């Protein structure tokens, strides 16, 4: 019997974010959640819960991590396992919000492709910047509609501080992060893993903020171990 698994994408990502990992997980029944319709993290979480099986394992990357933490807040009894990849329990700083607003202004001016290209050095390990992974990430981000991107940024900026809540998580938990993640550095994953009882921290070598595409073998291996807990 296949294990239900809900996978939540990050900002300006679609199901492609998870495709290489899904191909390596042969004991799951994966569903990639839709996070394109809501402008709040709580709204995204509620929509996912309405469509999800009664009980399921749950993984989110980056913005997806903010959403899965909200799902745990709303319905902890429905989740069997929790994975937090390249994400952060802290709220945005005012400096980070200002940077987001500047990017949003560029998108409103029709410069989505420029924003995508400028963002790649923060998303990928240096070794992955010249090659098929970088091109695939760029194509994925511009595939996501500008209106979706703007809604998601609004949701991210308004997210709560999840740090006080981490100690209450009572699930088999994987915290994973690319060793070269510049956008959400590994120290923030270490912080979460230390706060969640029994959490396992896995660092993916030669990967930045998107290890599901940069290091899918390592991510799938960690997730198989996690799902077997």
Indicate where each model-derived feature is located:
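Conserved HGGG/HGGXW glycine-rich cap/lid loop of the alpha/beta-hydrolase fold
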Residues: 1-47, 61
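Gly/Ala-rich beta-loop-alpha elbow adjacent to hydrolase catalytic centers
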Residues: 60-64, 68
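Flexible "cap/lid" loop of the alpha/beta hydrolase fold
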Residues: 73-74, 78-117
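Conserved alpha/beta-hydrolase catalytic His-Asp/Glu region
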Residues: 92-95, 110-168
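Short beta-strand/loop motif that positions the catalytic acidic residue
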Residues: 169, 175-177, 181
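Short alpha-helix in the alpha/beta-hydrolase fold that links the catalytic acid
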Residues: 171, 185-194
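Catalytic histidine neighborhood in serine/cysteine hydrolases
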Residues: 190-209
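Catalytic histidine-centered segment of alpha/beta-hydrolase-like enzymes
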Residues: 207-220
């Amino acid at each position: 019997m296949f294990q239900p698994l809900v996978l939540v994408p990050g900002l300006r990502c679609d199901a492609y974010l998870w495709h290489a990992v899904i191909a390596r997980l042969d004991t799951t029944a994966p569903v990639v959640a839709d996070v394109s319709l809501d402008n709040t993290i709580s709204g995204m979480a509620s929509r996912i819960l309405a469509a999800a099986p009664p009980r399921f394992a749950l993984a989110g990357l980056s913005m997806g991590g903010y959403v899965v933490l909200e799902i745990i807040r709303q319905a902890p009894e429905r989740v069997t396992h929790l994975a937090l990849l390249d994400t952060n329990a802290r709220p945005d700083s005012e400096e980070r919000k200002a940077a987001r607003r500047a990017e949003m202004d560029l998108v409103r001016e029709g410069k989505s492709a420029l924003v995508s290209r400028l963002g790649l050095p923060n998303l990928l390990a240096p070794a992955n910047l010249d090659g098929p992974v970088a091109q695939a990430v760029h194509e994925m981000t511009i595939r996501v509609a500008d209106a979706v991107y703007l809604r998601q940024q609004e949701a991210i900026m308004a997210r709560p501080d999840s740090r006080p809540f981490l100690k209450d998580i009572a699930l088999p938990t994987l915290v994973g992060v690319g060793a070269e993640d510049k956008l959400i550095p590994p120290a923030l994953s270490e912080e979460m893993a230390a706060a969640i009882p029994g959490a396992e921290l896995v660092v993916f070598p030669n990967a930045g903020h998107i290890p599901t595409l940069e290091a899918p073998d390592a991510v799938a291996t960690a997730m198989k171990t996690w799902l077997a807990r």
